[in-house]
């Protein structure tokens, strides 16, 4: 049995889980998400717990078991609490500002870069050097944060670029220089 797959998913108050063939809909205070489920797996909703069961110990079923359980758990957390990914901007003159719903990045190019949020994603800029990406879909929040980071990846030699807040800053040593 998959160690992750067999764990029950606690459903907080205010969150509803509906199971239909091939789909699990999760509705909560922050919104609604649907998770596709393989027809081979069985999703059981009890009072305030959701369980995923698999028909056999085939490799394919074991893989789908843990994956499906995690996707449903992420959806439950997303509609109840939401997800946040924080980015830091480092570099002289590098900054971000909120323009309507989108953000405008000044990161060393000859022009500012404007990033439009996809549906279900919002941006916050608490400081000119910090960006917060918020949403209920974990995958979408992570992808948008990765797209923003890719605009100006962290430099290997200088502490410049867009970093995840929890990302360690790794700098390579520069040239050793000529000895006298």
From Swiss-Prot:
Is the Isomerase keyword given for this protein? Answer: no
Q: What InterPro entries does this protein's entry cite? A: Ribosomal_uL6-like (IPR000702), Ribosomal_uL6-like_a/b-dom_sf (IPR036789), Ribosomal_uL6_a/b-dom (IPR020040), Ribosomal_uL6_bac-type (IPR019906)
Entry GO terms, CC: cytosolic large ribosomal subunit
A Pfam family reported for this protein in Swiss-Prot or TrEMBL: Ribosomal_L6
| BP term (GO), one | cytoplasmic translation
**Entry-linked SUPFAM superfamilies:** Ribosomal protein L6
- UniProt keyword terms in alphabetical order: Ribonucleoprotein, Ribosomal protein, RNA-binding, rRNA-binding
Any single GO molecular-function term of the entry would be: rRNA binding
This molecule's function is given as:
This protein binds to the 23S rRNA, and is important in its secondary structure. It is located near the subunit interface in the base of the L7/L12 stalk, and near the tRNA binding site of the peptidyltransferase center.
Family statement drawn from the similarity comment of this UniProt entry? Belongs to the universal ribosomal protein uL6 family.
Which HAMAP family does the entry mention? Ribosomal_uL6_B
Assembly, per entry = Part of the 50S ribosomal subunit.
- Name of this chain's protein: Large ribosomal subunit protein uL6
